[in-house]
């Protein structure tokens, strides 16, 4: 599939690690030039160093800071000469709280990174896409679809991301800007951190539930194999007639309401 995004200009937030890093590498391998945004400068610089020269840049950016977001997108406009695609993958979670004991500061942090970060980056991307169109892909979550009692702030934040995606897809469609979301269940560093805060019995129960409730056996998806092709589809010419959708890449769990 190399070359399918040749000439495309993209920004990937949260692009130094996890899903974002795989997407950034996959886009460059498909011919796109990418500005990678993150706060993990060591990982971001290392990723860019591993990619073909002049195809990728890294910039430190806190997606909750409007000034940093504006400056990053202005750099993209200068370096790339415009913007065709935003893949907004930056996000975070603080699991392990019930709704009744969730601290206000945790709620504020999780909502800020996930929901406010989506608002700021999408808005900045639209300004660069308004004249010629483009594609925005936001990372949602199964938590935002069904709600998870041990991840109340994350559920609320990702629910907001999915609602925002539908709202702006409607508003920006006349400008030929598509906006879609993906709700993945992948084996990533976020998933590992979630599993790490569970005890052995909770992990065992989770694995049993996953196998019982997923038609594909409960395995976590592989980003390169199961998620990246969809992101490239939505970003490229094959995705121009899809907008306002949430694509669950989760082995069928959403289909079964699990």
PLM ranges: what are they?
Residues 3-35:
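Canonical Rossmann dinucleotide-binding motif of NAD(H)/NADP(H)-dependent dehydrogenases/reductases
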Residues 97-99, 103-109, 210-211:
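Substrate-binding pocket helix/loop in short-chain dehydrogenase/reductase
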Residues 122, 157, 165:
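Active-site helix of classical SDR
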Residues 174, 181, 202-242, 249-251:
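C-terminal helical subdomain
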């Amino acid at each position: 599939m190399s070359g399918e995004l040749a000439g495309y200009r993209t920004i990937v937030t949260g692009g130094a690690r996890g899903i974002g890093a795989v997407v950034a590498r996959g886009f460059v391998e498909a011919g796109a030039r990418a500005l990678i945004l993150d706060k993990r400068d060591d990982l971001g610089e290392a990723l860019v160093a591993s990619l073909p020269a002049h195809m990728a840049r890294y910039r430190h950016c806190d997606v909750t800071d409007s000034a940093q977001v504006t400056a990053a997108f202005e750099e993209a406009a200068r370096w790339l000469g415009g913007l065709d695609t935003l893949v907004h993958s930056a996000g975070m979670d603080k699991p392990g709280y019930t709704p009744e004991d969730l601290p206000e500061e945790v709620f504020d942090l999780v909502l800020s990174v996930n929901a406010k970060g989506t608002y700021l980056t999408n808005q900045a991307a639209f300004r660069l896409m308004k004249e010629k169109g483009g594609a925005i892909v936001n990372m949602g979550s199964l938590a935002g679809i069904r709600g998870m009692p041990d991840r109340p702030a994350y559920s609320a934040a990702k629910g907001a991301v999915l609602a925002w995606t539908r709202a702006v897809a409607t508003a920006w469609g006349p400008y030929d800007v598509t906006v879609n979301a993906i709700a993945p269940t992948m084996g990533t560093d976020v998933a590992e951190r979630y599993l790490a805060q569970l005890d052995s019995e909770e992990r065992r129960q989770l694995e049993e539930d996953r196998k019982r409730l997923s038609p594909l056996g409960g395995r976590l998806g592989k980003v390169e194999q199961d998620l990246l092709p969809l992101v490239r589809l939505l970003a490229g010419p094959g995705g121009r007639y899809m907008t306002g959708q949430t694509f669950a890449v989760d082995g069928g769990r959403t289909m079964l309401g699990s």
